[in-house]
Amino acid sequence: MWKRCLAGCLCGLLLSALGGCARMVPGASGEPAGTADSGSERSEYAPYAGLWGLTAKQRQEDFAYFEQQLRENYPCWGILERNGTDYEAILDEYREMAAQTDNDFELYVAVNSALYRLGGEGHLSVIDPEWFSGFQDVYNELAENGSAEGETRERWREVLNDPVTAQNYGKLLAAVTELNAGEDSSSNPDAPAADAENVTTLIIEEGKIAYLKIDSFETYDADKEALQAFLGKVKGYEHLIIDITQNGGGSDSYWMDLLVTPLSKASLSSTNYALVRNSPNTAPYLAEAFAADVLHPISELPQLPALEPRDRELATHFVETTLETEPLGSGFDGKIWLLVSERVYSAAEAFTVFCKDTGFATVVGTPTGGDGIGIDPVYLCLPNSRLLIRYSPLFGLNPDGSSNEEYGSIPDILSPAGESPLITALRAIREG
């Protein structure tokens, strides 16, 4: 058994809170770029043609490497096939764009847009230049302080701190910033308001029903005091409703330390299977995250009724991931309800899985977005541009063997079509 890293490391990571995929092309539209024939785009990107000083051959090498490594390492091809994603046509289109362009920035656009079109399953995305330094900071801090389990994630830090990679991302950030200058952020309806509160609290019925809404598991330090105060205030209530319907992820440490530990009354443990492709790019990360005897040959995986043959075919090994918590104090005496939706992803999904496995909370709402079983996404570094592509190295399974990324978690109580999970939960409370 392996106890999952509790340091968070933006697991689910920062981009997950923005919808689970990276920014696609500079600009507020969020739409993928067209082919290399798009004259307006070529004109816009012209000042950045020599961004990294690459030759035409180097740009083509990068895209070829990107494509080859994706085929060898990415674990979610089965999901794309079941979704009807024509990934061969998508890769063909952007391979041609990378071959035709004489512009370094358009290589970034080609890779970024290809990943957008592939759908972002399993955290698949380019590391956004606007978030690069944030990832560096988190892993550098982890290296200095270690996690609760003594983990440091050295492989992750090594890739992010490569001097050429950091320099190239600095140049890319400058270009993206210049291209985005003057854009109206209001044109992106998903962009959070600058002063939006991450935590919302409400007393629905004095002494009986308390409501806590958390939109992200990223802001641990900023939210810690407010959460402690509110949970202390409602400790004697009969019901606590925790709403994560808009929560796209963040850090597992957030929900484990700030919610489960203070509210639970006993030790809790959740164990899940995950498939692994112990392939060339992924192997160094797995070697750091797992002891050798934790990686079990796929032939030893128990029979699971909903496991897709294609998913098993891609895997070389499997692991059992375990999350464990200990109570802090006397806990919450009442009943806890967790509200979820399709927007729940990554670390928020991990919380949902934990609640269902342990009974910590009754889950109410609609099926979730998934990808909450695993470890931090790993990086694929293109050799010339040093662009970083991330993907989840573990393919998490629900108890029946179905893909957690694909199907998410099914709530204990499903909300009827058109009904908010809060109304569903309040009705369940009223009906006893």
For the regions a language model picked out, list residue spans one by one.
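Extracytoplasmic/peripheral linker and loop segments enriched in polar/acidic and small residues
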Residues: 87, 91, 292-305, 407-432
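Positively charged n-region of N-terminal signal peptides that target proteins for export
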Residues: 1-5
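Gly/Ser/Thr-rich loop/hinge elements
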Residues: 251-334, 374-379, 393-395, 403-405, ...
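Long, folded non-catalytic interaction modules
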Residues: 110, 124-127, 255, 307-310, ...
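C-terminal motif of bacterial Sec signal peptides marking the signal peptidase cleavage site
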Residues: 17-20
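C-terminal regions of proteins
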Residues: 364-426
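Flexible, low-complexity junctional segments that flank or bridge functional domains
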Residues: 22-276, 284-291, 335, 367, ...
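Extended C-terminal subregions enriched in glycine
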Residues: 335-357, 362-370
